[in-house]
């Protein structure tokens, strides 16, 4: 089954350069099939369900298993709000965060502009990356992360992209405000939208 890739134009250009075999015609047997959808951060996008296709699910002790598409009505498309961010202190490396209803996910983002904060108004759950307490060239410091969470005002905030330079989970939890949590593998963030 084809993989849908949603990205900015420069990312597509890099994919076509680094993985030219995946875009070559005629298709090489066994090469991936990618459908690239270009995102412009000024416009929301709708992502449609692929429930008519088989899905791969990880089963502990077995590995990945194929499952048929779920029966029932196809869910409505999800509106995705791209949030323009930058991976460095300047604006030389564009990176996008996303808002899905009342959930926002921004990783590998050093900073966003005022328009980004506008798009985050009313979000209930937000995730931001932080690799260490101190300033990092491409990630916010822990204090910058906490300031970001305070400004956004979400009900629950999660820190991802954690490194060994931050405390162990239990200790880190004790240091953080009650509504800020270190993220973990397998975390499911709730939301009605």
Question: Where are the language model's segments positioned?
Answer:
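Binuclear metal-ion centers of metallo-dependent hydrolases, dominated by the metallo-beta-lactamase
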Residues: 113-193
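Binuclear metal-dependent hydrolase catalytic cores
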Residues: 1-105, 171-193
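Active-site-proximal loop/helix segments of hydrolase catalytic cores
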Residues: 91-96, 100-129
């Amino acid at each position: 089954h084809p993989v849908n890739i949603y990205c900015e134009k420069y990312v597509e250009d890099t994919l076509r350069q680094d993985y030219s075999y995946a875009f070559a015609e005629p298709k090489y047997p066994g090469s991936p099939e990618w459908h690239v959808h270009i995102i412009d951060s000024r416009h929301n996008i709708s992502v449609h369900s692929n429930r008519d296709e088989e899905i791969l699910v990880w089963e502990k002790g077995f590995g990945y298993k194929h499952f048929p598409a779920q029966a029932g009505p196809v869910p409505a498309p999800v509106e995705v709000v791209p949030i323009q961010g930058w991976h460095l202190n300047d604006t030389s490396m564009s990176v996008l965060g996303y808002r899905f209803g009342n959930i926002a996910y921004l990783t590998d983002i050093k900073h966003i502009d005022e328009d980004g904060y506008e798009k985050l108004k009313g979000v209930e759950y937000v995730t931001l990356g932080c690799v260490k307490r101190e300033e990092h060239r491409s990630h916010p410091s822990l204090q910058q992360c906490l300031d970001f969470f305070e400004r956004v005002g979400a009900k629950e905030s999660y820190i991802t992209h954690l490194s060994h330079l931050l405390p162990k989970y239990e200790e880190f939890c004790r240091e953080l405000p009650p509504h800020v949590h270190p993220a973990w593998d397998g975390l499911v963030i709730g939301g009605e939208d």
